[in-house]
């Protein structure tokens, strides 16, 4: 893949933010955002995925209490309890104390987060309201992004399937601070993809009495402003406009 087509990624997390066991790995991305991984063979994903491209958040202040059978991880706004086994409702929970949240019970693995919805993949055949995919914001203060099934990005810019059976979750515990949740989501997943400049060629057509020199200058001016063009049409001035007939061409000759 050509270099200019590759997505810039920073998938490696700050090692100071990582807590790792034989079959689990927890990454504290921010005081509100955790990455939760479980793998039976103890192999974890460091590559970017179709969804997550940047895990390079700064170091975060947190504490870990390990009783042998259970971990208790605390940040300023989150409390995670985990029994170090395969994720289950009894073994993995997280409570948030972020903005706007005071008495909401902890989230347990598998609980619906009752989020406010995300985006719709397509509007094909939609007539009116449509069902949205899960989002990262919730009146209950937390939401979960499950990245377990997305494809992984390769170093050459292509994609490859990930190994089955590995759980890869992102817990968002932002309370009602939706602006901060969206900001960190954009860092984690990258900005909204935009069409590249080379694919945005404009079509110029204006009914105007151009001369050859003025038309060339117009194109040069657009080029100086980095405005891309695919088509430039001379419009009506390729023929005489002061007569009924359209047969008298006024294009420059090909002698040059």
Regions found by a protein language model. Name each.
Residues 65-199, 206-207, 212-213, 219-224:
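Catalytic and substrate-binding clefts that recognize carbohydrates or anionic sugar/phosphate headgroups
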Residues 2-11:
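Short, Gly/Pro- and small/polar-rich lid/capping loops
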Residues 195-204, 227-241:
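Core alpha/beta catalytic barrel or barrel-like domain that forms the active/cofactor pocket
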Residues 12-15, 19-25, 29-34:
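N-terminal-proximal low-complexity accessory segments that begin disordered
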Residues 247-253:
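Conserved small/polar residues in nucleotide/adenosyl-binding loops
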């Amino acid at each position: 893949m050509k270099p200019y087509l590759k997505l810039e990624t920073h998938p490696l997390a700050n090692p100071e933010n990582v807590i790792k066991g034989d079959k689990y790995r927890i990454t504290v991305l921010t005081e509100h955002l955790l990455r939760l991984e479980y793998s039976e063979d103890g192999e974890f994903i460091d590559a970017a995925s179709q969804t997550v491209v940047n895990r390079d958040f700064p170091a975060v202040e947190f504490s870990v209490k390990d009783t042998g059978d259970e971990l208790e991880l605390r940040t300023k706004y989150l409390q995670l309890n985990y029994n170090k086994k395969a994720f289950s409702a009894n073994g993995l929970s997280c409570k948030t104390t972020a903005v706007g949240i005071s008495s909401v019970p902890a989230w347990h693995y598998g609980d619906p987060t009752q989020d406010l919805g995300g985006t719709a993949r397509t509007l094909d055949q939609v007539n009116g309201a449509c069902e949205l995919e899960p989002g990262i914001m919730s009146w209950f203060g937390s939401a979960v992004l499950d990245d377990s099934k997305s494809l992984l990005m390769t170093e050459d810019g292509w994609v490859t399937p990930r190994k089955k059976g590995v759980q890869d979750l992102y817990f968002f515990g932002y309370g009602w601070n939706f602006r901060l949740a969206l900001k960190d989501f954009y860092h984690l997943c990258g900005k909204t993809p935009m069409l590249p400049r080379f694919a945005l060629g404009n079509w110029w057509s204006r009914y105007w009495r151009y001369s050859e020199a003025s038309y060339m200058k117009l194109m040069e001016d657009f080029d100086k402003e980095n405005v891309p063009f695919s088509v430039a049409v001379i419009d009506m001035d390729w023929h005489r406009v002061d007569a009924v007939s359209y047969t008298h061409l006024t294009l420059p000759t090909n002698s040059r």
